[in-house]
UniProtKB/Swiss-Prot annotation:
Tagged with keyword Metal-binding: yes
Protein name from the UniProt record: tRNA N6-adenosine threonylcarbamoyltransferase
Family: Belongs to the KAE1 / TsaD family.
EC number: 2.3.1.234
Keyword entries, A-Z: Acyltransferase, Cytoplasm, Iron, Metal-binding, Transferase, tRNA processing
Catalytic activity: L-threonylcarbamoyladenylate + adenosine(37) in tRNA = N(6)-L-threonylcarbamoyladenosine(37) in tRNA + AMP + H(+)
Subcellular location: Cytoplasm
Upper taxonomic lineage: Bacteria, Pseudomonadati, Thermodesulfobacteriota, Desulfuromonadia, Desulfuromonadales
InterPro entries: ATPase_NBD, Gcp-like_dom, KAE1/TsaD, Peptidase_M22_CS, TsaD
GO cellular component terms attached to this protein's record: cytoplasm
Cited function: Required for the formation of a threonylcarbamoyl group on adenosine at position 37 (t(6)A37) in tRNAs that read codons beginning with adenine. Is involved in the transfer of the threonylcarbamoyl moiety of threonylcarbamoyl-AMP (TC-AMP) to the N6 group of A37, together with TsaE and TsaB. TsaD likely plays a direct catalytic role in this reaction.
Residue ranges crossing the lipid bilayer per the database entry: none
Length: 342
């Protein structure tokens, strides 16, 4: 099946063409980072306006790069949620209009479902596996038994890991978004320079907490007489990142051991983090687990990642009606098969 996919849940407008749920023919992303960087975070109203300006352009670009005509498209998959309602509605409106005008099936897909299935676009990852979904809005562990079959194993109790990176970056005067900047500084710093807390590591569950690490760094910054810069800044960034990454790795590996799952997928925007990729890779190999990451281009929000689930749902006859609406809050374990049909 030749599928057109649309993503507009936050601050990236994306369209892709995916064949048979695995072959990415194009994946076009229009980023809004420069717009929101001025405000230190995503402004929902601005995000919606920028999506409206970009959505038709990215669709045209995706079709052109894939070298297919609009009439060749056999189905459409679109992010239904979770995310910013106004932003989601732009993608949904475009998807529904195209599905109606072309008389082709439509299916709404969960944003994080796209992320945790993204490695399947590039690698053979047999089910079942443990997925760490880690981004600016999510830090969850899921047991993935198949497409549409997800069970929550653990979750953040407060901030998501990506949110903590962004807040700490703002606190240190590094701007928005913060993940890439901190990762770059951390590579040149001493991760043992400061001992920031590792919350919940001694708890027997698989839940996360990152607000304590962020608060500890805030108190440290307030205790300094001058600005944190130079080698000092690099050491603070490295120590903060080390604390976050260590919590993510230890909790994930503990969950893998106790669930008996031998394969681990790490996905979402924070999966681009070089420190996380290195530590998870080394520790997983040491304990005999296979770990899979999407390539960096499939870690950030993108439309191609919707192709895996979208193709499977449509091939199975699971379609959405044209009255499909956005869901700003939508637990993934309530979004699998046959939920897109409802």
């Amino acid at each position: 099946m030749l599928l057109l996919t649309l993503e507009s849940s936050c601050d990236e407008t994306s369209a892709a063409v995916v064949r048979d749920g695995r072959q990415v023919l194009s994946n076009v992303i229009a980023s809004q980072i420069d717009v929101h960087a001025l405000y230190g975070g995503v402004v929902p109203e601005l995000a919606s306006r920028k999506h409206m300006e970009a959505v038709a352009v990215v669709v045209d670009d995706a079709l052109r790069q894939a070298r297919v005509a609009l009439g060749d498209i056999e189905g459409i998959a679109v992010t239904r949620g979770p995310g910013l309602v106004g932003a989601l509605l732009v993608g949904l409106s475009m998807a529904k209009a195209m599905a109606m005008s072309l008389d082709i099936p439509l299916v709404g897909v969960h944003h994080m479902e796209g992320h945790i299935l993204a490695p399947l676009l590039e690698q053979d990852v047999p089910f079942p596996y443990l997925a760490l979904a880690v981004s600016g809005g999510h830090t969850h562990l899921y047991r993935v038994d198949g497409i549409g079959r997800y069970r929550i194993v653990g979750r953040t109790l407060d901030d998501a890991a990506g949110e903590a990176f962004d807040k700490v970056s703002k606190l240190l005067g590094l701007g928005y978004p913060g993940g890439a900047v901190i990762d770059r500084l951390a590579a040149e710093g001493n991760p043992k320079a400061f001992d920031f807390p590792r919350p919940l590591l001694k708890k027997p569950n698989f839940d996360f907490s990152f607000s304590g690490i962020k608060t500890a760094l805030l108190y440290y910054a307030q205790s300094q007489k001058g600005p944190i810069e130079g080698d000092h800044l690099r050491d603070v960034a490295a120590s903060f990142q080390q604390a976050v990454v260590e919590v993510l790795c230890k909790k994930t590996l503990r969950a893998a051991r106790e669930t008996g799952l031998q394969r681990i997928v790490v996905a979402g925007g924070v999966a681009c983090n070089k420190g996380l990729r290195r530590m998870m890779g080394e520790r997983s190999a040491k304990e005999g687990f296979q770990v899979f990451f999407p390539s960096p281009g499939l870690c950030a929000d993108n439309a191609a990642m919707l192709g895996v689930a979208g193709d499977a749902y449509l091939a199975g006859g699971c379609t959405s009606d044209l009255d499909l609406n956005a869901r700003s809050n939508w637990p993934l374990d309530q979004a699998g098969w046959p939920q897109p049909c409802r």
